[in-house]
Protein backbone atom coordinates (compact mmCIF):
# COMPACT_ATOMS: atom_id res chain seq x y z
CA UNK A 1 0.00 0.00 0.00
CA UNK A 2 1.55 3.21 -1.17
CA UNK A 3 1.16 6.76 0.07
CA UNK A 4 0.04 9.30 -2.49
CA UNK A 5 -0.74 12.95 -2.92
CA UNK A 6 -3.64 14.56 -1.11
CA UNK A 7 -6.23 15.55 -3.72
CA UNK A 8 -9.22 16.52 -1.58
CA UNK A 9 -9.89 16.92 2.12
CA UNK A 10 -11.55 13.48 2.28
CA UNK A 11 -8.64 11.68 0.62
CA UNK A 12 -5.95 10.47 3.00
CA UNK A 13 -2.28 11.04 2.24
CA UNK A 14 -1.97 7.24 2.31
CA UNK A 15 -3.60 4.02 3.42
CA UNK A 16 -1.39 1.57 5.25
CA UNK A 17 -1.74 -1.42 7.51
CA UNK A 18 -0.40 -2.39 10.90
CA UNK A 19 2.42 -4.92 10.50
CA UNK A 20 0.26 -7.87 11.62
CA UNK A 21 -2.52 -6.87 9.21
CA UNK A 22 -0.05 -6.48 6.34
CA UNK A 23 1.32 -9.98 7.02
CA UNK A 24 -2.22 -11.37 7.14
CA UNK A 25 -3.18 -9.71 3.85
CA UNK A 26 -0.02 -10.92 2.12
CA UNK A 27 -0.78 -14.48 3.28
CA UNK A 28 -4.14 -14.54 1.51
CA UNK A 29 -4.42 -16.52 -1.70
CA UNK A 30 -4.54 -14.38 -4.86
CA UNK A 31 -8.12 -14.17 -6.08
CA UNK A 32 -9.65 -15.24 -2.75
CA UNK A 33 -12.94 -13.68 -1.73
CA UNK A 34 -11.45 -12.19 1.44
CA UNK A 35 -8.58 -10.56 -0.45
CA UNK A 36 -11.03 -9.12 -2.99
CA UNK A 37 -13.25 -7.51 -0.34
CA UNK A 38 -10.24 -6.18 1.59
CA UNK A 39 -8.81 -4.58 -1.56
CA UNK A 40 -12.22 -3.14 -2.44
CA UNK A 41 -12.51 -1.66 1.06
CA UNK A 42 -9.01 -0.18 0.89
CA UNK A 43 -9.89 1.40 -2.46
CA UNK A 44 -12.94 3.05 -0.88
CA UNK A 45 -10.81 4.38 2.00
CA UNK A 46 -8.23 5.74 -0.46
CA UNK A 47 -11.00 7.92 -1.87
CA UNK A 48 -12.68 8.83 1.42
CA UNK A 49 -11.03 8.32 4.79
CA UNK A 50 -14.38 8.98 6.49
CA UNK A 51 -16.18 6.13 4.66
CA UNK A 52 -16.24 4.04 7.81
CA UNK A 53 -18.48 4.52 10.82
CA UNK A 54 -16.84 6.54 13.57
CA UNK A 55 -16.80 4.69 16.88
CA UNK A 56 -17.59 6.73 19.98
CA UNK A 57 -14.59 7.15 22.29
CA UNK A 58 -16.46 5.58 25.22
CA UNK A 59 -16.87 2.42 23.11
CA UNK A 60 -13.16 2.06 22.22
CA UNK A 61 -11.91 -1.37 23.28
CA UNK A 62 -9.00 -1.02 25.72
CA UNK A 63 -7.01 -3.24 23.35
CA UNK A 64 -6.72 -0.46 20.75
CA UNK A 65 -6.02 2.25 23.30
CA UNK A 66 -3.28 0.23 25.01
CA UNK A 67 -1.67 -1.23 21.88
CA UNK A 68 -1.91 1.79 19.55
CA UNK A 69 -2.77 4.78 21.74
CA UNK A 70 -5.66 5.66 19.43
CA UNK A 71 -7.72 8.80 19.87
CA UNK A 72 -10.07 8.02 16.96
CA UNK A 73 -11.41 4.74 15.67
CA UNK A 74 -13.51 3.72 12.67
CA UNK A 75 -15.29 0.56 11.53
CA UNK A 76 -15.72 -0.24 7.84
CA UNK A 77 -17.97 -3.16 6.88
CA UNK A 78 -16.27 -5.14 4.12
CA UNK A 79 -19.34 -7.39 3.85
CA UNK A 80 -22.06 -8.59 6.22
CA UNK A 81 -19.54 -10.71 8.18
CA UNK A 82 -16.20 -8.89 7.98
CA UNK A 83 -15.09 -5.64 9.64
CA UNK A 84 -12.04 -3.49 9.00
CA UNK A 85 -10.99 -1.38 12.00
CA UNK A 86 -8.88 1.70 11.31
CA UNK A 87 -7.64 4.95 12.77
CA UNK A 88 -6.56 8.27 11.27
CA UNK A 89 -3.05 9.50 12.03
CA UNK A 90 -1.57 12.93 11.28
CA UNK A 91 1.70 12.74 9.34
CA UNK A 92 3.90 15.33 7.66
CA UNK A 93 2.28 14.60 4.30
CA UNK A 94 -1.29 14.76 5.63
CA UNK A 95 -3.65 12.33 7.31
CA UNK A 96 -3.01 8.60 6.92
CA UNK A 97 -5.50 5.77 7.27
CA UNK A 98 -3.94 2.99 9.36
CA UNK A 99 -5.72 -0.36 9.29
CA UNK A 100 -5.44 -1.91 12.74
CA UNK A 101 -7.40 -5.12 12.37
CA UNK A 102 -9.63 -7.15 10.06
CA UNK A 103 -12.19 -9.15 12.02
CA UNK A 104 -14.96 -11.61 11.32
CA UNK A 105 -18.27 -10.78 12.97
CA UNK A 106 -17.71 -13.10 15.96
CA UNK A 107 -14.25 -11.67 16.74
CA UNK A 108 -15.60 -8.13 16.25
CA UNK A 109 -18.36 -8.75 18.81
CA UNK A 110 -15.83 -10.21 21.26
CA UNK A 111 -13.36 -7.33 20.79
CA UNK A 112 -16.06 -4.69 21.31
CA UNK A 113 -17.77 -6.52 24.18
CA UNK A 114 -21.01 -7.32 22.36
CA UNK A 115 -20.68 -11.11 22.50
Where are these regions (language model features)?
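Arg/Lys-rich, positively charged N-terminal/basic patches that mediate binding to nucleic acids
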Residues: 1-47
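Solvent-exposed, non-transmembrane amphipathic alpha-helical segments
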Residues: 41, 45, 58-65, 93-98
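A short, surface-exposed loop/turn module that caps and links secondary-structure elements
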Residues: 47-76
Amino acid sequence: MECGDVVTSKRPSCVKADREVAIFISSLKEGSYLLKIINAGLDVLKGNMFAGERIERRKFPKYYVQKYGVNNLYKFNLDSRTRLIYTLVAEETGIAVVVLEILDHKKYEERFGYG
